[in-house]
């Protein structure tokens, strides 16, 4: 969330950010509720002082009539306090709800747009493969190479679940090991994180849906959710702590990810591209305010290194205002070339990295001491290292050959133990 003083002092900036994101929020209502809350707190303080004064007088040696009068006054004050405290509770709940809706401000270089078509392409890297045969999509390859089974998964678990089989199992594990080893070599602390988080942590990370429907699963009769990303559990790791940020804290977390993906159907969402469960390695960093921009660029550089070493053609996008999540100050996406996408080939999102500044840490009370010994809220940066399902799509579709098999990128062979997946009759 944003600091209330910052909102008051930069009201036009905050309103422009809300409008640029395509959100409809009444920021003046938030200010009104904050003013009302403060007035109620002041009134409650004044009434408590009167009540204490009234109680002190009752300790004195008084005649019966005056004592009865003080008792009646005490009852009136008590009732007034109860009413005001109940009103304060209602106003505070409304205030918190409105406060959580306010998104982060935007970096000055975020493109202003009204759809994903307005995302700005920064560059393209790699050569898109030219086949002298009709390439298959990953669903055909998964069937012909006996790697994927959606039909049995649909019977057992429902739509948008899948079985990985045979070499695809080792390919997923190889991608995880490849990315975790790279991040460890770059100084990241490596974690396997819980797949469940408590509601206040999910809320603190700021997963604000545009509609009323959350994209993650709540566990019935609990305050817990299945995580949609280990950003949630890594980001919550230092909840309510003052941390040492002499150096940035870089973390890499492996987790399963669970998402509802309601309404996600059609050619562009088929197969492994948009599923209810997948595995992912996430990068996360806690740093000082002045370091988050550099860390954000560092995360993008690591993502580019990963896809360059995997030999997958990709492009980098600066994400426009409409396409940003509420916590993000700035976001980059990498989209990989997928020859089977939409029947003719196209780029599909495989990673994102976001600088969330102190938007998340303010909710989660994660602080550090600056050089003057003052508590400051940490800046938090996140980014995908590997989301296995979409990278498997890219590998199968880009490295297929005329014999119907698939070559494994050289950087993965030491992790898979094989360099080729042959066609199976």
From Swiss-Prot:
Residues the record lists as binding ATP: 259-261, 275, 349-352
Q: Which domain of life is it from?
A: Bacteria
Q: In which pathway does it act?
A: Aminoacyl-tRNA biosynthesis; selenocysteinyl-tRNA(Sec) biosynthesis; L-seryl-tRNA(Sec) from L-serine and tRNA(Sec): step 1/1
GO annotation, cellular component aspect: cytosol
Name the EC number(s): 6.1.1.11
Question: Catalyses which reaction?
Answer: tRNA(Ser) + L-serine + ATP = L-seryl-tRNA(Ser) + AMP + diphosphate + H(+); tRNA(Sec) + L-serine + ATP = L-seryl-tRNA(Sec) + AMP + diphosphate + H(+)
Q: Any idea which positions bind L-serine?
A: 229-231, 282, 384
Q: Does the keyword Kinase apply?
A: no
Task: Drop me one GO molecular function for this one.
Answer: ATP binding
Which keywords are on file for this protein?
Answer: Aminoacyl-tRNA synthetase, ATP-binding, Cytoplasm, Ligase, Nucleotide-binding, Protein biosynthesis
Pfam families assigned: Seryl_tRNA_N (PF02403), tRNA-synt_2b (PF00587)
This protein's record includes keyword tRNA processing:
no
CDD domains the UniProt entry points to = SerRS_core
One GO term (biological process): seryl-tRNA aminoacylation
Localization, UniProt: Cytoplasm
Q: According to its record, what is known about the domains?
A: Consists of two distinct domains, a catalytic core and a N-terminal extension that is involved in tRNA binding.
Subunit description: Homodimer. The tRNA molecule binds across the dimer.
| Role according to the record | Catalyzes the attachment of serine to tRNA(Ser). Is also able to aminoacylate tRNA(Sec) with serine, to form the misacylated tRNA L-seryl-tRNA(Sec), which will be further converted into selenocysteinyl-tRNA(Sec).
Q: Which family does it belong to?
A: Belongs to the class-II aminoacyl-tRNA synthetase family. Type-1 seryl-tRNA synthetase subfamily.
Q: HAMAP family, from UniProt?
A: Ser_tRNA_synth_type1
Which PANTHER family does the record associate with it? SERYL-TRNA SYNTHETASE
Q: What is this protein called?
A: Serine--tRNA ligase
Taxonomic lineage: Bacteria, Pseudomonadati, Spirochaetota, Spirochaetia, Spirochaetales
Gene it is expressed from: serS
